[in-house]
């Protein structure tokens, strides 16, 4: 067998009959499988041991040789080789066919490759192959030409003879008629009788004439067919063919069935044909040229690949190894078998019958019928159901053919090659583990024992608890007490991976240090739930064990949860306090006016109270019960840094040093909160809303090492839970208060609604107007009830606390609980004009309950659909971008894109761009950022973090040029500098990072949050597509619904307002021809945009428009943008449009992820003129390949090819990839494989998918070539200390925040310079 790590490419081609016979270990001659009495394989059958190898290790069929010592001997009695039984998984056989058959993939695929090669229509091809028509395979033109005159003379003689015969017959009949009539005359018969005789005589003469004419026509037909006879001509009329064969058999040959196709291919001159086709393409026009282009693709494929087209017609069929199509006995004595065995059996049966018929010399018609049946059975074996009705098994189920085994989700590619099951894994229910550190998880003892079994067994032997591995295994299985101690020792420092399905992004798998726990549930740290999207309502998680030292190192350094605090999509922290923790911290930092022990200033006779010399004193007071943590106090602080403005005021330019004292007016709770933050972090004197907490953690992530951030969020978690418990925030029915003003508010709106109803009944309003008015009224009513509710609730109400702290829920939900539900939609998505007036606290009436179910049901159905759609979108995105890997440090390009930092207002002030976080942030500057005076504020090549952006804004810079993957010039993949900072680590992206997959996950993961619907815009007929469908539409580069025209030129608008349509004409500024857009539906509305004077209004007559500007509401067609404005603009357009959808849902994704996908969509060029290159006109070529080939041609002073950029949807781009393995495992498997085989495609194994399929390490991360050859060798000391390492947590979370000594080096402090 090949070792998977030692080949560089994988080629697929057409197998000839010779290849098939070479692979084979013998011919399968009988359809039998096994003998049902002895259950042993039949000789020469489909499971024959002589062909495929023995069924039991080292044992021949007849039992003469049993034992490994006879290895390699071939038994002289039964002919079976003595070897391992596993060879039955790899040895193939073959069936020698009595007549050739065509391969259905090449004849029936779209387009039919055989048809294109031979220039035959698929319909004609089908007639030939299935014995419905003859085809002429060759004509001896010379001989025919030489003897044409003789043959013509013979034909004339024959025609003359027919005519003479006709004339003689007519003469004789006429005379007989005359005689008959004379006789009747003599007898004096009536005129009636005479007329009858005459009529019958004339009728007979007419028949004679017709018969002769038919014979003459037949001769004419035969002759004209013969004179025009040419190869590849079809003759459907069997009699005509027989006549031709009888008369002129020596001048031509013809046949039917696959044999005739085989003959045509044998005589086919590929080079000559290619030359003819190239000539047609150069000089032809229209349909002829198109057809020649399509044919040349197939012909050139055979010409260039050196494949023999004879492979499309088979003389032998390979039989796959028997273990891959097993026959197993079930418990009832019945057998279950793979469908392939049935299909092979049909082929063998028909083949044997055909051989017998040929030997017997059966009539041609019977033999042909048997050949047709053989062809059909081979078709069914290769691709059942592709032609005609599929062959069915018991219960009318179509049998699964070889093609079906590869196709689809259950096929070989997706089920077994890309989705393998893994050993050293387990799964269990998860429960919360609030006592864990961020990098720990609780692993049930029993599960850990099973997972680490080999390690435990080895260690038991090492420690002399067991004599050998076998007794160690017994000890483990019986769970002896010493096993647990050893287990504790073995799992120390050995990370495990936890995974929760669905794994929508890379944080769905993270590494943790296992802690042994009782019970059978895995304990999960509360802060990682956000990343896993886990909750504890019965979710399950899988555990995997990294085995090798390298795998453990990767798990520990790259995948440990405390190193994955930031989201790869937006670079913002995901490990944030949520729910209870937020409530706890919010409660802790709330200030309550006049609470127990609050600060009171000095009055005449009493001194001031609530003043403390240190936090310790305040805590003692709280413990004594004289001070509330939420009361305002004055306290002297020495270990907490004052806020910036106080620091400047008190400590001047030297700044605050630990130990310097200052007095803060704050609450004890806030002091306690600030003590959780790292030393030297400025004091935060605010109430901790969730957003404020997020901002703090964000800031920590920007400024401190990850290890500090991890420790801090862990402390916040502990504190949050502690204070949430102490706060006693719970929800009970008594907390849901209905506002007392609700009834009077509703009564007043009821009156207004009555008025509208009356107007409607009087006919003053039509139905739509009435509904609109009512919807408006009840929307107002709902808002007012909400307002009343807000005023009525006390500030310390638990529900309000939960909502206001940002822990969960929103005000709308509170209003639904206690106020009123308000308006709901019907199944069409329109508002029902009667609202739900009850709140859930009061209870709904039956009618209200019924109306409410519409929306609820639609929501559930929507969610289910959305999940499937979103998963499919992710799959396509991953497929198109999976080979985008960071390949080099810097591609040295000068190009970049301009991004906005701020907008300058009329009065000169700058308004910060709201989307700066996802556009400019975390990029590399492509050119110096210079202020108006010409000073460099940030130099080229610097990373734009928050401080740099602030510096630019302070210097009044409104836009900067940044590097982008859209302009990266790296051949395959991208360079680190163009990509910029990795969002997940906050550092420049590493070489080998699979940024394509990260991008696909970042876009696909929030897909389920996007809405499904297309929403109606206030009474406009045209739907505006939004949500998930819009994202799909953009990435698939489809023409959008409600497509809006864009200006092709810069110029003045002339607007004609028709009855139902607008007509817009643009008069170009450069005096060219005016561009007219007619039939623009009025329902779509004209576009509102900014005019030169800064005002915003609708497009009107005489306005000036720029090229590419949208003229109507709706979405521009990206293909139009590409045509009018070029590739750069369409890239920016796509990124902007995708971002709009995500922003509408409040999802933050960095532009760079979308750019990675968009770059893949614009990777190809379509060839317009091939020049001196090898490219075919109309073909799609990778841009890098196109440019390289053009450079080569120009260097040889030839004519370069001309091409234009083309925008491909992600599905099409995935299928057009250079890797046939990747494309075949994506979609349309048979089509991809057919194409690849004809072209003799070679897969260079550059992407990730191809390598996963063949089982190599993926060429990303540590699998990239430059790291591939680093082996991990433990040092002597490490070997000795292998099991004596102290626990991880001691050094990881030392109580003060100084870096502790010890074995663990935080990733941030680790220098990688020597590896690069």
Curated annotation (Swiss-Prot):
What SUPFAM superfamilies does this protein map onto?
beta and beta-prime subunits of DNA dependent RNA-polymerase
Please give the Pfam families that the UniProt record associates with this protein. RNA_pol_Rpb1_1, RNA_pol_Rpb1_2, RNA_pol_Rpb1_3, RNA_pol_Rpb1_4, RNA_pol_Rpb1_5
What InterPro entries does the entry give? Answer: DNA-dir_RpoC_beta_prime, DNA-dir_RpoC_beta_prime_bact, RNA_pol_asu, RNA_pol_N, RNA_pol_Rpb1_1, RNA_pol_Rpb1_3, RNA_pol_Rpb1_3_sf, RNA_pol_Rpb1_4
Q: Which UniProt keywords apply?
A: DNA-directed RNA polymerase, Magnesium, Metal-binding, Nucleotidyltransferase, Transcription, Transferase, Zinc
Residues given in the record as Zn(2+) 2 binding sites: 891, 968, 975, 978
List the catalysed reactions: RNA(n) + a ribonucleoside 5'-triphosphate = RNA(n+1) + diphosphate
Q: Where does Zn(2+) 1 bind?
A: 60, 62, 75, 78
Q: Which cofactor does it need?
A: Mg(2+); Zn(2+)
If you read the UniProt record, what top EC class would you report for this enzyme, in one word? Answer: transferase
GO-annotated cellular components? DNA-directed RNA polymerase complex
**Which amino acids does the record list as binding Mg(2+)?**
535, 537, 539
What Gene Ontology terms describe what this protein does at the molecular function level?
DNA binding; DNA-directed RNA polymerase activity; magnesium ion binding; zinc ion binding
Domain of life where this protein originates: Bacteria
Q: Would you indicate the residue range of the signal peptide? A: none
Q: In which family does this protein belong, per the annotation?
A: Belongs to the RNA polymerase beta' chain family.
Tell me the function of this protein. Answer: DNA-dependent RNA polymerase catalyzes the transcription of DNA into RNA using the four ribonucleoside triphosphates as substrates.
Q: How does it assemble?
A: The RNAP catalytic core consists of 2 alpha, 1 beta, 1 beta' and 1 omega subunit. When a sigma factor is associated with the core the holoenzyme is formed, which can initiate transcription.
Q: Which NCBIfam families match?
A: PRK14906.1 (NF011498), rpoC_TIGR (TIGR02386)
What is the name attached to this protein's record?
A: DNA-directed RNA polymerase subunit beta'
Output the lineage of the source organism.
Answer: Bacteria, Bacillati, Actinomycetota, Actinomycetes, Mycobacteriales
């Amino acid at each position: 067998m090949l070792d998977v790590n030692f080949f560089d490419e994988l080629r697929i081609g057409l197998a000839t009959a010779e290849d098939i016979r070479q692979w084979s270990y013998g011919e399968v001659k009988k359809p039998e499988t096994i003998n049902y009495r002895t259950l042993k394989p039949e000789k020469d059958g489909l499971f024959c041991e002589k062909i495929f190898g023995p069924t039991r290790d080292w044992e021949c069929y007849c039992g003469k040789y049993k034992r490994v010592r006879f290895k390699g001997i071939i038994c002289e009695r039964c002919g079976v080789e003595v070897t391992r039984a596993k060879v039955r998984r790899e040895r193939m056989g073959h069936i020698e066919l009595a007549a050739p058959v065509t391969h259905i993939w090449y004849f029936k695929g779209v387009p039919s490759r055989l048809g294109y090669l031979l220039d035959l229509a698929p319909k004609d091809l089908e007639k030939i192959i299935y014995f419905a028509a003859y085809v002429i395979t060759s004509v001896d033109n010379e001989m025919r030409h030489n003897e044409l005159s003789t043959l013509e003379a013979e034909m004339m003689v024959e025609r003359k003879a027919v005519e003479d015969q006709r004339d003689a017959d007519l003469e004789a009949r006429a005379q007989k008629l005359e005689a008959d009539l004379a006789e009747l005359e003599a007898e004096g018969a009536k005129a009636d009788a005479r007329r009858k005789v005459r009529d019958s005589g004339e009728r007979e003469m007419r028949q004679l004439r017709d018969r002769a004419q038919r014979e003459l026509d037949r001769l004419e037909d035969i002759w004209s067919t013969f004179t025009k006879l040419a190869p590849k001509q079809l003759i459907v009329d069997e009699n005509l063919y027989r006549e031709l064969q009888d008369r002129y058999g020596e001048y031509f040959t013809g046949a039917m069935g696959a044999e005739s196709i085989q003959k045509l291919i044998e005589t086919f001159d590929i080079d000559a044909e290619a030359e003819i086709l190239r000539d047609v393409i150069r000089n032809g026009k229209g349909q002829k040229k198109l057809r020649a282009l399509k044919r040349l693709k197939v012909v050139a494929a055979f010409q260039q690949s050196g494949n023999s087209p004879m492979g499309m017609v088979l003389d032998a069929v390979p039989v796959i190894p028997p273990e891959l199509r097993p026959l197993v006995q079930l418990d009832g004595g019945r057998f279950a078998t793979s469908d392939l065995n049935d299909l092979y059996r049909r082929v063998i049966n028909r083949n044997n019958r055909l051989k017998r018929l040929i030997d017997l010399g059966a009539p041609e018609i019977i033999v042909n019928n048997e050949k047709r049946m053989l062809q059909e059975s081979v078709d069914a074996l290769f691709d059942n159901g592709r032609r005609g009705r599929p062959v069915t098994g018991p219960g009318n189920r179509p049998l699964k053919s070889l093609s079906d085994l590869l196709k689809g989700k259950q096929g070989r590619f997706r089920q077994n090659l890309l989705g393998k099951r893994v050993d050293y894994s387990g799964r269990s229910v998860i429960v919360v583990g609030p006592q864990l550190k961020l990098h720990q998880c609780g692993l049930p003892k029993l599960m850990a024992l099973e997972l680490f079994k080999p390690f435990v067994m080895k260690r038991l032997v090492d420690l002399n608890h067991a004599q050998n591995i076998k007794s160690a295994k017994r000890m483990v299985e019986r769970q002896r007490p010493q096993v647990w101690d050893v287990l504790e020792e073995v799992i120390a420092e050995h990370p495990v991976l936890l995974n929760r399905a669905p794994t929508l992004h890379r944080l769905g798998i993270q590494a943790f240090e296992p802690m042994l726990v009782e019970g059978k549930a895995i304990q999960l740290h509360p802060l990682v739930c956000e990343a896993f999207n886990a909750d504890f309502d019965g979710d399950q998680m899988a555990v995997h064990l990294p085995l090798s030292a390298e795998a453990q190192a990767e798990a520990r350094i790259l995948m440990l949860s405390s190193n994955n605090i930031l989201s790869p999509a937006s670079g913002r922290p995901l490990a944030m306090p949520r729910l209870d923790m937020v409530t706890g911290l919010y409660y802790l930092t709330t200030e309550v006016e006049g609470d127990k022990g609050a600060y009171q200033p000095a009055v005449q006779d009493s001194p001031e109270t609530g003043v403390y010399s240190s936090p310790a004193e305040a805590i003692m007071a709280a413990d004594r019960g004289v001070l509330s943590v939420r009361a305002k106090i004055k306290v002297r602080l020495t270990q907490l840094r004052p806020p910036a403005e106080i620091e400047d005021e008190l400590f001047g330019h030297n700044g605050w040093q630990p130990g310097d004292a200052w007095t803060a007016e704050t609450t004890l709770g806030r002091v306690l909160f600030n003590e959780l933050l790292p030393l030297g972090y400025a004091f935060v004197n605010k109430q901790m809303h969730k957003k404020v907490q997020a901002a703090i953690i964000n800031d920590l992530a920007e400024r401190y090492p990850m290890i500090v951030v991890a420790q801090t969020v862990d402390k916040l978690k502990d504190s949050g839970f502690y204070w949430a418990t102490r706060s006693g925030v719970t929800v009970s029915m008594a907390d849901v208060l209905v506002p007392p003003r609700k009834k009077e508010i509703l009564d007043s709106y009821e009156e207004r609604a009555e008025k509208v109803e009356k107007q409607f009944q009087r006919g003053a309003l039509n139905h739509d107007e009435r509904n609109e008015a009512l919807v408006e009224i009840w929307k107002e009513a709902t808002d007012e009830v909400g307002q009343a509710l807000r005023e009525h609730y006390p500030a310390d109400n638990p529900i309000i606390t939960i909502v206001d702290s940002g822990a969960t829920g929103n005000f709308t939900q509170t209003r639904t609980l206690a106020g009123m539900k308000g308006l709901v939609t019907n199944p069409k998505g329109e508002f029902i004009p009667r609202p739900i007036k009850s709140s859930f606290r009061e209870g709904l009436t039956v009618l209200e309950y019924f109306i409410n179910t519409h929306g609820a049901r639609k929501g559930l159905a929507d969610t289910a659909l959305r999940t499937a759609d979103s998963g499919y979108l992710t799959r396509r995105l991953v497929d198109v971008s999976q080979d985008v890997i960071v390949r080099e440090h810097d591609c040295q390009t000068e190009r970049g894109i301009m991004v906005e930092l701020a907008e300058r207002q009329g009065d000169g002030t700058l308004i910060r761009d709201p989307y700066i976080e996802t556009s400019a942030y975390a990029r590399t500057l492509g050119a110096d950022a210079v202020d108006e005076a010409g000073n460099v504020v940030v130099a080229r090549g610097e990373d734009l973090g928050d401080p740099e952006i602030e510096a630019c804004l302070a210097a009044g810079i409104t836009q900067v040029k940044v590097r982008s993957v859209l302009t990266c010039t790296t051949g395959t993949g991208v360079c680190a500098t163009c990509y910029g900072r990795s969002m997940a680590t906050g550092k420049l992206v590493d070489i080998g990072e699979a940024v394509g997959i990260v991008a696909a996950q970042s876009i696909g993961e929030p897909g389920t949050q996007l809405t499904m619907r297309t929403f109606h815009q206030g009474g406009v007929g045209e739907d505006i597509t939004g949500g998930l469908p819009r994202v799909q539409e953009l990435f698939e580069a489809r023409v959008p619904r409600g497509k809006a025209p864009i200006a092709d030129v810069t110029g003045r608008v002339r607007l004609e307002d028709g009855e139902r349509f607008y007509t817009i004409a643009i008069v170009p500024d450069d005096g060219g021809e005016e561009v007219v857009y007619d039939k623009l539906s009025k329902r779509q509305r004209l576009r509102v945009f900014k005019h030169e004077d800064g005002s915003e209004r609708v497009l009107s007559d005489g306005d000036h428009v720029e090229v590419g500007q949208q003229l109507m509401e709706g979405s521009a067609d990206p293909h139009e943008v590409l045509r009018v404005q070029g590739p750069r603009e369409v890239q920016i357009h796509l990124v902007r449009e995708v971002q709009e959808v995500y922003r509408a849902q409040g999802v933050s994704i960095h532009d760079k992820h979308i750019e990675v996908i968009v770059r893949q969509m614009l990777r190809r060029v379509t060839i317009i003129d091939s020049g001196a290159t090898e490219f075919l006109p109309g073909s799609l070529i990778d841009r890098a390949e196109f440019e390289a080939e053009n450079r080569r041609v120009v260097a040889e002073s030839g004519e370069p090819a001309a091409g234009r950029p083309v925008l491909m949807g992600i599905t099409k781009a995935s299928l057009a990839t250079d890797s046939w393995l990747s494309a075949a495992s994506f979609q349309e498997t048979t089509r991809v494989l057919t194409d690849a085989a004809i072209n003799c495609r070679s897969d260079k194994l550059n992407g990730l998918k191809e390598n996963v399929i063949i089982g190599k390490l993926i060429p990303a991360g540590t699998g990239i070539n430059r790291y591939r050859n680093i082996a991990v060798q433990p040092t002597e000391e490490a070997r000795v200390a292998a099991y004596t390492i102290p626990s991880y947590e001691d050094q990881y979370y030392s109580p003060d925040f100084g870096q502790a000594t010890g074995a663990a080096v935080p990733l941030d402090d680790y220098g990688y310079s020597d590896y690069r």
